[in-house]
Amino acid sequence: MVRLNHSAIVYTPQVMLNGKDFRAWGSDSFSRAVGEINRQPAHAWITLTLSPSDSNELQVTANARARSGVALYVALYENNLQSKIKAGENQGRQLHHDSVVREWYGPLSMDRDGRVTWQLSVRLSPEWVAAKMGLVAFAQDPTTGEILQAIRLPWCAG
């Protein structure tokens, strides 16, 4: 993403919005920019499924359609994590984390008809909690960084 913006600078926390560096992510302008993007029609189509296959394994399926050349990315995330900080500026604090990426997949390439179907069995590490997990996926134009569609599927233990 940094290279697509003709930059060599990576910093934390760095937020990219639709393939562009967005330094004002802590301001109201970020919410407005996200809202504007969300009002636009998607230029790709993505579906996700997430289901248990046994007590410590999840079945993940992603289907997507977009123009040829577009890349699909899928991430398995976990919410409601905590860490006790032992050193540095936050020493002694208990930090809370959501949307922590546990597994990252991609780029998955569309075929010449602009389709991709991808399936995987994910064995959960002992410290992961399936009920706190979910999937996100996005289709991205690799030449411009533009996000053509993005979706999130939280775990539903229904």
Residue locations for each model-derived region?
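Short, conserved sequence motifs used for protein processing/export or organelle targeting and
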Residues: 1-158
